[in-house]
Curated annotation (Swiss-Prot):
SUPFAM superfamilies: P-loop containing nucleoside triphosphate hydrolases, TrmE connector domain. Belongs to the TRAFAC class TrmE-Era-EngA-EngB-Septin-like GTPase superfamily. TrmE GTPase family. The gene is mnmE. This is tRNA modification GTPase MnmE. GO terms for cellular component: cytosol.
Amino acid sequence: MPPLEDTIAALATPAGISALAILRASGPDTRRIAEAILGRTPLPRRIQRVDYRDRAGHILDEVLCVFFPQPRSYTGEDLLEISTHGNPFIAQRVLQDLFARGCRPAGPGEFTQRAFLNGRLDLSQAEAVMDLIHAQSDRALAAANHQLRGSLGRHVQRIIDRVVRVLAQVEAYIDFPDEDLPSSNRDTLAAELEMARHEAEQLIATQRYGNLIRDGIKTVIVGAPNVGKSSLLNRLVGRERALVSAEPGTTRDFIEERIAVGEHCIRLVDTAGLNVSPAPLEALGIHKSLEQLADADLVLAIVDLSDPEPSLPPELAKRLDPKNTLLVANKIDLCAGKCVLDTVDQWFGMVFCSAKIGVGLDDLFGAIGRWADQWQITVGQDVIAVNARHSHALALALEALDAALDKLRSGDAAELLASDLRSALLALGDIAGRVDNERVLDELFATFCIGK
């Protein structure tokens, strides 16, 4: 883990020409460096304009400086932010001057890591910073903001408090080995642990929603050749992304694009049509299509209404899960006769549209949004969306709570019961980072960008 006694500096904005560039410095020498740059004692949390001079006295730029004294800064340390004009050459000259004044280059995520180590953020809030940076939809943004403001930490702390209350009573009996926990006490403690267990299960149930909003809803477009899959992709994306031809088998490989549908991010995947007797190259495309289908969150199964008997290929239909399949009846403008399908009731929903002229797209967007909305679970007033790390820790806590409940009900020794409760607390503590695990922390913050 990087030493906290160093003063670090980095560019906090992306490299490249822009209106502004922002540099950060944080650590014990920050106040001294700020005084040298400003030529006076820095005013806390006030924007101060100054000609930035390097150590040789050369003016590099007219900049704006803001000094945040500890502990009320992002990192919990003295922190300086410098805004320069967005010329990469100027930003690099200022950064090199900060290094010459005693700063060292910050590692990836080191500013946020210091915020965590100095108690400004818990680990789940630090992860929310990364979620906020990468959010690609309103739902992802909302969930990240809730987590950044401590929503997940509060709910986990509520579970921890319940377990601690039970553990305190159990350990009181360990000090008096001649006495057993009375059955009435065991019932009360079991009820408390059942509540803790229920709350942990509620949080775990939000992981599916968390995956969807963080990664985007992988929506795979499937169907027979020439039913309009690529035309639909192009229409949804708003440009000619996929090649469209009257010749079957034009799409040989899958194509992926991201679009916003309401408050959701959708990862659209166009696939090769499922042909009965494909050519060798086309067969390879079909194999890739089936791989994408197996990994889909949502499937848009396309049927062609210009066909007198519109239907899905049997080989495709048997692979579809009705709960995540939306039937899309395309080419409504060319409907040849039968415009109601016998199998419509078995799917999540059905939409009529024309990819060619753009009819029915609002209905399609609405259906996709409704499918995604069903996964959102609010816990109290909070939007919670746990990630895989949180879910794993909660699962370990559940396992320990179940073991504790079994021992509590069977009248096992208080020492054994206390051991399970401590295991549950250890797992729950991992979520907020209250358990010291240096390797885990280093790996997590290494995924952040430099300057954050």
